[in-house]
Regions:
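N-terminal glycine-rich FAD/FM-binding segment characteristic of electron-transfer flavoproteins
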Residues: 1-120
Length: 120
């Protein structure tokens, strides 16, 4: 599993990291925009000029889904996108899409997983 954040995080990856902590063997990724803003290191970047990933589940949060980003995650078996914009490209490419504010939704998912004891 890879949980990534983009411009929609507004630089706050706390919720992204908390969700990743609740799912065993999960990595944190980011969009190029987040790297360019200085919010994440280049090593976290998913995309054409970053990492090519192929997890069972990819959870992009606040990522628009630019073509360059989609090149990096096209090997994902399932994409569960969380974005406030239902028309964002990532939402059209996702297997599952949640139209919501990641700052509310991602912590709620992490809290629910924690309550169910999913963390290792």
């Amino acid at each position: 599993v890879v949980v990534s954040g983009g411009r929609g995080t507004e630089g706050d990856f706390t919720a992204i990291e908390a969700l990743a902590d609740q799912i065993p063997n999960t990595a944190v990724g980011s969009s190029r925009a987040a790297v360019n803003e200085g919010w994440r290191p280049h090593d976290d970047q998913v995309g054409q000029t970053g990492n090519k990933i192929a997890p069972e589940l990819y959870i992009p949060c606040g990522i628009s889904g630019a073509v360059q980003h989609m090149v990096g995650c096209k090997g994902s078996e399932n994409i569960l996108a969380i974005n406030t914009d239902p028309e964002a490209a990532i939402m059209q490419k996702a297997d599952y899409a949640i139209v919501a504010d990641l700052h509310e939704t991602v912590p709620a998912i992490a809290d629910e997983l924690d309550a169910r004891g999913h963390a290792e």
